Every structure is written in C-alpha cells, then in structure tokens.
Amino acid sequence: MRKAERARKTNETDIKLSFHIDGEGKADIQTDVPFMTHMLDLFTKHGQFDLSIEAKGDVEIDDHHTTEDIGICLGQALLEALGDKQGIKRYGSSMVPMDEALAQVAIDLSNRPHLEFRAEFPSRKIGTFDTELVHEFLWKFALEARMNLHVIVHYGTNTHHMIEAIFKALGRALDEAALIDPRVKGIPSTKGML
C-alpha cells in the first residue's frame, strides 16, 4: 500500500496529513486557508488520491506559513509513499482547460528537485489568499518530494480559473507519473537508480 503520514508542529503551524497514492479521489481537508483547501480538494479528486489534512496556522499574520508547511508535508508524504519507485512510470504530464484558462504541468519523479513556474496572475489576491503562495506551495512540494516539476499557464484572464487549472493538471500529471506500469521492470532509469 503506497501510503504515508506526516505531522509537523512548529511555532507557526500544526499539521497532520495522510496521503494515499492509489486512492479513490477522497479528500478530507480542513485548513484555515479556504482557497488552499479548495485547490487541494481539486488536486485530490483529479489525481484519484486519498488525502486527509488537518492544518492550523498563524493566519492572523497571513496564509504563508500554513500554505508552505502543507507543501512540505505533502512532498515528504509523497516521497515516502513512492518507496523505491520500482515499476513507476516516472513521467507524467497534463494540460487542463478551465473556461478561458489553460494550464500545463509536467512531472519527473527523478530525485532531482526543481520547479519551473511560468504563470502571471492578473490578481494578486483571491479573497485573502496571496496568489504568490501558489509558487511557494509548489516549490516546497517539489523540493520535499524530490521531483522535477514544470508548471505553465499558457493563458487566462481569471486568476481563480488559472490556479484551478494548475491544481487539476498537477493531480492528473502526478497520477500518471506515480502509476505502476507492469511493463517497467525495476527502476525506470538507465542508470539503475533515481
């Protein structure tokens, strides 16, 4: 069973997270950052993962610490759940439209953490959520999961739609990359290791 749990308690946040790669798209996400909760629901549903999160943070300051620490915990849980990565497809990509917006995500579960982020959002905020935190979340997620993550928003005029397309594409691309392919024997690399 490819599943992992993480807990992180600091002076800024208190997070408990459970992530199951081979799930059914079930989300039980409770955070004090409503927009992030919504995006993680979409990620879970479209990736067919099971994800449970209880997160509290110092949102009276802003949403930064909570959003960042969720990315850290989710990345660590993904890395553990993948195990030795034997038999996985390793690569995944998805292009998702959301009304006028189009986002593309490509992933390599390579143990070479990198984020390439090409998105310019028309609005700096959605409600109280700072849109720059999308980059912060994705960078911490990629770093802790040790994955190469490329995110491009090709176009869009509605910031909510653009970010929603990113999280749906992220779920779909990760589902593909983490999939066990019976044709893959051992580690999916000519080096023999990732």
Curated annotation (Swiss-Prot):
It holds the Pfam family IGPD. Pathway: Amino-acid biosynthesis; L-histidine biosynthesis; L-histidine from 5-phospho-alpha-D-ribose 1-diphosphate: step 6/9. Its main location: cytoplasm. It catalyses: D-erythro-1-(imidazol-4-yl)glycerol 3-phosphate = 3-(imidazol-4-yl)-2-oxopropyl phosphate + H2O. GO terms for biological process: L-histidine biosynthetic process. GO terms for molecular function: imidazoleglycerol-phosphate dehydratase activity. Belongs to the imidazoleglycerol-phosphate dehydratase family. This is Imidazoleglycerol-phosphate dehydratase.
